[in-house]
Amino acid sequence: MLKFICYPKCTTCQRAKKWLDDNKIEYELRDIKLDNPTFAELSSWYKLSGLTIKKFFNTSGLLYKSLDLKNKLPEMSEEEMLKLLATDGMLVKRPILVGDNFVLVGFKESEWSEKLK
């Protein structure tokens, strides 16, 4: 079953959830703030996604900005970045949809349609 990791108050996550429900796609819901991803999960998702590690950061979030990560990330290793992401779910871009052989980060309807229909 798909894992849908989101923050319920996030409007993009709400749109993604509605899209999943409207398309009758079953998923397991997980609140990223209450149950943030572990280092092992993030490492696995990062490898499976084919994305750059920076795509996993919620660059518009208050925590990202308050920690000045825009300037700090370029000096960090991938392992350091993954460990940092694992400290607080609010640092992680959302929603995340995890399937057996794919990971989608953020909600782009066309991308989700291509993977799921």
Give, region by region, the residue ranges found by the protein language model:
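Local sequence-structure signature of Cys/Sec-based thiol-disulfide redox active-site neighborhoods
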Residues: 1-23, 27-32
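Thiol/selenol-based redox catalytic cores and closely related redox-interacting motifs
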Residues: 34-117
